[in-house]
Amino acid sequence: MNIDALSLDPNTINFLKSQGYTKLYPPQEDAVKTGVLDSKSVLVSVPTASGKTLIAMLATLSHLSKNKSKVIYLTPLRALAAEKFEEFKKLEKINGSKLKVAIATGDFNSKGNELDNADVIILTNETMDAMMTFQKSWIYEIGLVVSDEVHLIGDSGRGPTLEMILTRLKTGYIGKKPQIIALSATISNSSELAEWLGCKLVESEWRPVPLSEAVYSNHTITNQDRVESEGNLDKKRETRHSKPAIGLGLDTVEDGDQSLIFTMTRASSVAAATEAGKFVAEQLKKDELEKLLKISKTILPKETEDQTKLVKKLADAVKNGAAFHHAGLDQRCRTIIETEFKNGHIKLLTSTPTLAAGVNLPARRVIISSVFRFGPNGNAPISILEYKQMCGRAGRPQYDDEGESIIVAKGSPNQYLEHYVDGIPESLESQILGDSSLRIHLLGLIATSSTFSPISEEKINEFFSQTFGGLSDDKLESKISTRLKELKTYDMITDEGGFKPTKFGQKIFWLRIDPKTAFDITAYLEDYVQGNKHTFGFLHMITNLPEFYPQFGVTEKLEEKMEEIHDNFKHEKLYANQKLDQDWTKSLLILYHWIDGMTYSNMSQEFNAEPGDIFQIRQNTEHLAYIIREIARFWKNQVLVDELDTLRQRIRHGVPEKYLDLVRIKNVGRVRAKMLYKYNFHNRVDLRKVSLEKLAAIDKIGMTIAKSIKLQIE
């Protein structure tokens, strides 16, 4: 079907053509014929890179041409939301259009009343959940919902929130029932998911670039048709590396294409990129290497003390045309790598599996170095769905006539071919009725449904029976009854002719935390030790909460360090029975040294903690400290509220308490604060006394920063 045949106005058709769209892919045509332009709800279950975004865009344009209601686009990740915002922002350029696109994710937020005035809003699922919690006025104006990566309903972490959002929307619990466009990877129970959502199903295995799936074993590549070949694999090169995954990747680079290698650990990702880079560089021209040298310089932070070994290794690999990508890198580094791989400057990229579910970085050849990944319980095989998402990155539309994915096998290739290549992705299983999820969302339902009158258990059961999990669980009512009793025990709900939240329950609902965790925190605070500071005690408690992540284990080398810290801080117990010498992890050590001002390079050397890890730890810790602070405030414990306010500032800035007055000044971060303190400028009063010239002469300050400081404090 040609773009011209769509029932859209001429200006919109011309815009789509200007973006390179002339003809619809088969799944896109199927979606149009199924009714996405006619207000029909549709679940599109197709492989990666099969044009799902254009389907959402067409539905959006059609909806807004006929209705005044809003379109919301839900994504599971902030990076994906930013990507979609860039794509949908282009719609504002349609001739004669007054269309406005906004974003709300926590990292990237439109300002002021832009969400109220926007026609299209891009949100993460968690942000949408918060908007529903705060009952923003515009949520009653939603006419079309696009849910990207809807198969993540089966994810134990993010799934329950998404499931509750969709249940509320599809049942008309908030506003009118909207049109729903759900975008999913290929799953085996897509018909069940479509029926639950009230969607028609569009299902296809079609890809814009044909995919060849194969398994490598013992110098031989066996494809999905069981045809064996050596491919173009250079056995000498493979032997030189002793790692077939690298040889397979380099083979593609030699042909002038890009390759993506999935490794199962961060260390193997770094090692593979470092090793492969030496040989990638041999294939590159002088001007390509010069460009890569410039890119590598942008990777290194300006401050020497922020240059960790990991970042230096990344910069060195990039010089050679290779790179690695994992959660240990900070967002700045990851963005550079993603951009330069898309631009074609980086030829070989290694990554942990997290990239498969993240931003779209296709390559001619994808190599899966192992089908095992390390998890909480040791090594475990990846799911078929994970495998399909990885190999779905193979083949770049407009560049490749074929994409290749290759599993590196140990032993016979047959079991890999049968299980992964021929396999059907697992069925989605709802996570909404797990103990923690059910407590959170039960309290949420009661808090939002009983403004004027209590909600009955019958109504609660009726609502949860409309969730994806509630459809088939014959123990639904029993599970709900058990969790309701728990909430009453926690003094978060009352049952007097129906359920209503107590003031405490309402508070915990606003905080969006497991009621059991909130109950435990309350018990700790009631038993708090008076007269002391509790900094270490708070950090110990936070790192032991179920909601805390990422959690890193402890090595023998760190045992002695922890014992030493415990001896110094045992007087900082938060509550009487707190055992500071037990239940601690490396994450606690990282936090303690972070708020003491330790540099990134030293953190990396001492604890193997990288900037990306530290960012996640401090962000999550600050959030949990805020929750604890709000619980302390609810119980009118001002002493702990004040202490937690200070702790949160230290977590945010990564400094000792004595630097806090300095880091509150814009452009004075932890590095400059340390330098100012060294020169006896301990606070704003000291800075007011010094001349502009003397302030500018201090290392790492300079005239521009000095003027900025003076403007703020005088």
Predicted regions located by residue number:
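A short beta-strand element within the Helicase C-terminal
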Residues: 348, 355-372, 404-406
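Conserved P-loop/Walker A NTP-binding site and adjacent catalytic elements of P-loop NTPases
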Residues: 15, 21-174, 178-186, 190, ...
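Conserved two-lobed SF2 helicase motor
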Residues: 116-133, 321-324, 341-356
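Helicase-associated low-complexity/disordered flanking segments
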Residues: 1-30, 34, 38-42, 285-315
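C-terminal helical accessory/scaffold domains
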Residues: 439, 444, 481-664, 670
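Conserved interdomain linker/interface between the two RecA-like ATPase lobes of SF2 helicase motors
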Residues: 183, 190-275, 323
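Conserved segment of the helicase C-terminal RecA-like domain
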Residues: 372, 383-419
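Conserved C-terminal RecA-like helicase domain
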Residues: 73-74, 82-85, 89-102, 267-348, ...
